[in-house]
């Protein structure tokens, strides 16, 4: 029997506000433990929350960008539970009437088809504190308590771990492009829980669901869902009974680990938050927020394909972050060579950034300098290989490529006569290569070209070298 997965994702995104959702404490990441706190976010008696207007605006903005309907009347609710990271013993969130509902994201599958993943709801809530487990005991840091979140709950429309990854990547790119969240998974500002079950292909009845936590990267998400899918299929095939569980992804051992069995009934005893009034959102407010939404990543990617003529794949990669998209567009315009701009950014520049673990915004050179490098190569002033060496220098120093070329004497040798002299010398010293060429071994020419480039320290024009070597070899 063939099975398929039924997957839904719950994504928590910390909002990029300066202050917390119900008080004036800073949302800055880090800091000494329990220094970004006040009576409100600590839940001390007599303290009263006040809803941050910017949080509501960001909730509306996210909803519009994700094709949601905005609930014009919504409210905050108390979610009651006891845990050390929750100082009030309840979380102020939204239950029955969230700020947004019925949205969707479109992802592109491997075969080029588009698939729509439904979004059931988006609701606003406060984050909890953080627990630090030590040998001596467990410590609690409440700096994060009260930091504003939106939780984006997908419908169970996802059928493979790969689709789940594409959904999360698309969601991340949209949220960061509209600047409601920095979406830094390594800092916990974008967190994802997954719900997965399996069912026979063609069936409409979902199986028993597992919730998976601690998936803090795209790779972890895909691996955890794949593992859990295999575990469910194996259990069902053997006739074993699965229980509804919450499990944790163990990255070190590449397995999911049981955290707790889950009660089927909702035991959080939600009820309306009496200290906050019902929220009324006018059409005028929604339209004001709509005007602040920039060109979204998929719209930008489509424009890049049409305007710059780059491949669709390149456009999708370049628009994963707005910083990269902006850097590409400025370079493409200034260099008048969009394909070269795309190749440099997706190739050598991305490699260097990955090696040093830095982002585009932290590069020491700007789009104008990269455009200058591309123009130097296109004009024949330097070769592509020399261009890579110049880029390495730009990456370290931030110097202009022209200055680097002049300082290091890297100008390309386009003098065919001078190159001919080097070629003759190389051929004279390598008679066996000429013999191999005559015997039909075309690669012998490549060997000779390599020797010429080495002799000229990479400064000879490769096109001229190839031409002269071929001409001289054919004379022999």
From Swiss-Prot:
Q: Name one GO molecular function term.
A: ATP binding
- Superkingdom is Bacteria
Which is one Pfam family of this protein?
Answer: GatB_Yqey
The protein's UniProt keywords, in alphabetical order, are: ATP-binding, Ligase, Nucleotide-binding, Protein biosynthesis
**Catalytic activities:** L-glutamyl-tRNA(Gln) + L-glutamine + ATP + H2O = L-glutaminyl-tRNA(Gln) + L-glutamate + ADP + phosphate + H(+); L-aspartyl-tRNA(Asn) + L-glutamine + ATP + H2O = L-asparaginyl-tRNA(Asn) + L-glutamate + ADP + phosphate + 2 H(+)
The answer, when asked if Oxidoreductase is one of the entry's keywords, is no
Q: Name one GO biological process term.
A: glutaminyl-tRNAGln biosynthesis via transamidation
Record bears the keyword Ligase: yes
The record's EC number reads 6.3.5.-
What's this protein's function?
A: Allows the formation of correctly charged Asn-tRNA(Asn) or Gln-tRNA(Gln) through the transamidation of misacylated Asp-tRNA(Asn) or Glu-tRNA(Gln) in organisms which lack either or both of asparaginyl-tRNA or glutaminyl-tRNA synthetases. The reaction takes place in the presence of glutamine and ATP through an activated phospho-Asp-tRNA(Asn) or phospho-Glu-tRNA(Gln).
Query: Tell me, how does this one assemble?
Result: Heterotrimer of A, B and C subunits.
The family classification in the record reads: Belongs to the GatB/GatE family. GatB subfamily.
Could you tell me what this protein is called? Aspartyl/glutamyl-tRNA(Asn/Gln) amidotransferase subunit B
Q: What is the lineage of its organism?
A: Bacteria, Bacillati, Bacillota, Clostridia, Eubacteriales
